[in-house]
């Protein structure tokens, strides 16, 4: 799990910053918390900054995380995930899993790019 999760609302976007070691079970917990904050605030744009995750995330964990996100039914929500280059690749796997399941998501390496996409 990210050892630290910070959530704030700024300019109509739920900003979540996560850091520390990755654990699939804890990642599911923080994802649920982030989506719930958006629903409580009536905000359908979420930016998750995961650049401070310190461990490699396996392909199977990315797939399972994607399936869990789909199970939360975020279809009215746009989600931008910012990660380090090595976390985003290979081939934007997490993004492909989610887009193929009709989730409005973008996985990028820069906050600017995430904000541009969210405010499109």
Where are these regions (language model features)?
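Amphipathic, Lys/Arg-enriched alpha-helical "gate/interface" segment within cytosolic domains
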Residues: 1-120
